[in-house]
Amino acid sequence: VSDDPSNLEFQPRAKGSVMGFPAHEGRPGALGEVHARPHPLIEKPRVLVQLAFMTEGGSGVDHAVLSELSRRLGIAAPDRQARHHAMKWGKGSLRWERHTEFSTYLWEGPLSESGRSHEDTPFGNGFSPPGTVISGIRLEIRKWTPTSERLIAAFDPTSLCYSLVERGNAAIVTDFRQDGDGMTRILVLDRGLTPARTGALSQRLIDIETYRTLAMLGLPLALTLSGRARRIEDRLAQTTLEMKVAETRDSQTLLADLTELAAELEADAASSLYRFGASRAYD
């Protein structure tokens, strides 16, 4: 604002400032993160195929995969520090995102009304996975018609999940089963969603299935530690009983037993800290 308080015309602010005050250096990145994952605009009918890979090899493996895909298209590869990237692929588009311990490759393309997809995903010959697959999703978006309703019969009725969303303008169908390609199938029947709402709904469904699978990575470890915890409890109870009734064992021996139990318990807690923390974050 000009020096004259009666003049309400706003003058250009200094770059990196808020109301004339210096902005924190991390503020642009923090604000930009809100817009890092915009919902795609999706016209129907459409098919989305996403694979999520565990990236134990680090971000360099993803960059090598993206560089090869870019080379095949004759375009520039993304920056090594990039966390997301998009490119045209065939009749659709490919979006990549890097997360803490996994990365996702999402291909979106056309789907004919007859039920046949024109899929030319990058996941065919020549695609080098950056790690092992933890989640695979195939999501089809179709107009809600009597013909498309018949596709519900292809899902397992014993585990069928059917939900009406968006005030009844769309239905979500899945059975959480995997098809012959190992993909979890989701069907969205649409009778009035805008491309923006369709994109937002699709992204949420894909995120739910991806994070559901990642959260369950802690289950095998929890089952293993559950048995170990029971054994530690039994040994602690036995040692405590000996402290009360046995006169033959000296205090140093009992103390050594207790110390060993404490160390074993602490080691198990430390080894599970990251996995359980990740499961809570994914939940």
Task: Show which residues each predicted segment covers.
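N-terminal pre-transmembrane cytosolic regions of membrane proteins
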Residues: 1-140
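Structured core elements
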Residues: 50-52, 185-187, 278
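Intrinsically disordered or highly flexible coil/loop and linker segments, enriched in small
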Residues: 79, 214, 235-245, 267, ...
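Extended alpha-helical interaction modules
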Residues: 97, 107-257
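Sequence-level detector for tyrosine residue identity
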Residues: 105, 162, 211, 274-276, ...
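Membrane-associated alpha-helical segments
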Residues: 253-283
